């Protein structure tokens, strides 16, 4: 009996083993994705069935039946991110960027995703405190939470993320001070020795910038603290970070003198100190020979002449010194740096004559000297194209027709890589560079600190367009072409904004799979622009013209495979059942033979047939007495402990 039960249990085990092979998704992972789907009012359209890996759910990547990546950029997903995400124990990438319908706080147990490397939630609508448990994601490399509505403070536990490369929380409502370690049990941002990017701009961070935040062991290249409420002085320890290339401290409430120790940052290319409350005089920064951009506008420096050392900064392209009480005349060599493109000196007390001389940069495009005391302007030769603004200077206060330099002319932002001769498209479509009408991905590239400022030279933008196009083609993305247009500078933070259009390949609109791929290239910073454009963020517009689910063919193939596997399973089960029944029949026959007392009677060697037992027969006492002749001793065959027989 026990052997029959064992065989039956083996059959059940084999059945479930076969079923588990036929489903290509780990059971726990499948349940977790189903729970996520239940939280979303608009999940991807092909998220159907119970086998996300086997039926190729859009945005889901699997390895060995485990979900390792979720990438759903700009797929109009709406709802909340539930704690069920923590069940995906093999997850390495989570990218939900550009889904503005994703709201609510992050789940507190998100730190259970021990293998997570990329957490990318750019441009959603998440709120609340960043969970402390994020500090448990020991494998994390990219942490991009920018362009949301997060509040609260920066978790000190993030200091434990020893592999973190990219840390971006810009454009939120995060407040409080910057956490630093206490040398014993409490972690802090000073422990992030491998991190290259601190992007904290446009928040509500306050207090002083801690002295022990920076050290010579750090490898930071970008420190972007602009648009916060920091107070106090620039810490001298900042100059210990020799790898720094971009420093943005503008639009805070910093005070004191600008430290001369900044001269130690010899790799620095961008220095933004504008719109603070710095005092004293501007220090000599001649050691910053790699500097492209210097912006010290709108501080409370003491009155001083224009620094002569400016002309020694050979790499300087953009100089902004608005409203810092500069006086006297402009030095003859002031415009001589070979890369100089833009000079902003408005709202000062500069007087005398504006004369570019003969040694000015041939890259020079724009000079703004509004609200000064210039009374003479010696214009350069007629073949020189420099836009000069001298409005509200004595030279422009004479009666009569005023020259162009006495008016503020807005910069030309009409540049576009889409030919103006294209026939206008209908139904909300856009013309591609080849004049083909389609529904492109449209968004804006925000370049946070470009190393150039001139908008008149189209070469930089042609290089950018080709760079993006080549990137997509090299990786065989479903992209036909890209276009850029509406180039402008943000007047507040001087970021460079460019509208980007990415056109689908071989169809009128993207499917969901193609959309996910394109957006991940930007959200994950897989695409890297030419060096002169610096750090960037892409913000995609909502997309509502999907051509199909993007995974229907895969789903159909999954159904076909499932049906085929089911048929094989059924056939195998029937075969196993037949084998089992045959073996049971043979066992029954062997048992019958063993219980037959005449089973080995050899009739070939005897003329007498084997006795045929008809069953047990009962005899009465009288019959026994008669047959034994009243129990005569002549019929005695033997004796035993219980009497004679």
Language model features by range: what are they?
Residues 613-634:
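A short, low-complexity linker immediately N-terminal to eukaryotic Hanks-type protein kinase catalytic domains
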Residues 1-583, 589-595, 609:
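Plant-biased, solvent-exposed loop and capping regions
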Residues 634-645:
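Protein kinase glycine-rich loop
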Residues 588-616:
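Cytoplasmic C-terminal tails of single-pass
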């Amino acid at each position: 009996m026990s052997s029959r039960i064992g065989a039956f249990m083996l059959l059940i085990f084999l059945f479930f083993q076969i079923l588990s092979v036929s489903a290509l998704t780990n059971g726990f992972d499948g349940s977790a994705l189903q729970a996520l789907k239940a939280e979303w009012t608009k999940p991807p359209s092909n998220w159907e069935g119970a086998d996300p890996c086997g039926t190729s759910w859009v945005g889901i990547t699997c390895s060995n039946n485990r979900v390792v990546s979720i990438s759903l950029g700009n797929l109009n997903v709406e709802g909340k991110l539930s704690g069920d995400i923590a069940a995906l124990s093999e997850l390495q990438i989570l990218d939900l960027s550009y889904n503005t319908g994703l709201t609510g706080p992050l789940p507190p147990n998100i730190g259970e995703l021990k293998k997570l490397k990329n957490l990318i939630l750019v441009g959603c609508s998440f709120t609340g405190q960043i969970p402390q448990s994020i500090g448990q994601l020991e494998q994390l490399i990219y942490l991009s939470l920018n362009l949301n509505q997060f509040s609260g403070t920066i978790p000190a536990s993030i200091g434990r993320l020893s592999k973190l490369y990219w840390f971006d929380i810009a454009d939120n409502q995060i407040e409080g001070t910057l956490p630093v370690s206490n040398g014993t049990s409490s972690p802090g941002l000073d422990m992030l020795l491998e991190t290259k990017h601190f992007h904290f701009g446009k928040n509500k961070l306050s207090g002083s910038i801690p002295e022990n935040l920076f050290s010579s062991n750090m490898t930071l290249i970008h420190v972007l603290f602009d648009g916060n409420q920091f107070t106090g002085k620039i810490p001298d320890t900042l100059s210990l970070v020799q790898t720094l290339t971009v420093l943005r401290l503008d639009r805070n409430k910093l005070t004191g003198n600008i430290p001369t120790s900044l001269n130690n940052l010899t790799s620095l290319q961008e220095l933004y100190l504008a719109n603070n409350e710095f005092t004293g005089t501007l220090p000599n920064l001649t050691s910053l020979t790699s500097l492209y951009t210097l912006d010290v506008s709108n501080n409370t420096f003491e009155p001083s002449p224009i620094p002569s050392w400016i002309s020694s900064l050979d790499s300087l392209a953009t100089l902004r010194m608005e409203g810092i009480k500069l006086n006297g005349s402009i030095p003859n060599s002031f415009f001589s740096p070979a890369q100089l493109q833009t000079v902003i000196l408005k709202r000062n007390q500069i007087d005398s004559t504006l004369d570019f001389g003969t040694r000015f940069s041939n890259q020079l495009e724009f000079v703004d000297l509004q609200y000064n005391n210039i009374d003479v302007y010696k214009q350069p030769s007629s073949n020189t194209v420099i836009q000069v603004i001298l409005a509200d200077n004595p030279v422009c206060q004479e009666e009569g027709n005023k020259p162009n330099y006495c008016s503020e002319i807005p910069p030309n932002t009409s540049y576009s890589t889409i030919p103006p001769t294209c026939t206008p498209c209908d139904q909300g479509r856009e013309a591609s560079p080849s004049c083909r009408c389609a529904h492109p991905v449209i968004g804006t590239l925000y370049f946070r600190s470009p190393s150039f400022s001139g908008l008149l030279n189209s070469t930089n933008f042609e290089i950018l367009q080709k760079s993006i196009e080549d990137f997509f083609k090299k990786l065989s993305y479903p992209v036909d072409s890209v276009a850029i247009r509406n180039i402008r500078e943000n007047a507040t933070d001087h970021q460079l904004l460019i509208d980007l259009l990415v056109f689908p390949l071989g169809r009128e609109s993207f499917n969901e799979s193609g959309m996910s791929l394109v957006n991940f290239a930007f959200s994950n910073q897989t695409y890297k622009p030419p060096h002169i454009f610096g750090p960037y963020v892409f913000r995609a517009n909502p997309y509502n013209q999907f051509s199909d689910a993007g995974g229907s063919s895969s789903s159909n193939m999954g159904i076909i495979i499932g049906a085929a596997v089911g048929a094989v399973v059924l056939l195998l089960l029937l075969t196993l059942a037949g084998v089992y029944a045959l073996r049971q029949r043979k066992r029954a026959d062997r048992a019958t033979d063993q219980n037959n007392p005449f089973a080995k009677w050899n009739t070939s060697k005897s003329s007498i047939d084997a006795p045929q037992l008809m069953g047990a027969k009962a005899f009465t006492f009288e019959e026994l007495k008669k047959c034994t002749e009243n129990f005569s001793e002549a019929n005695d065959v033997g004796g035993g402990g219980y009497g004679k027989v």
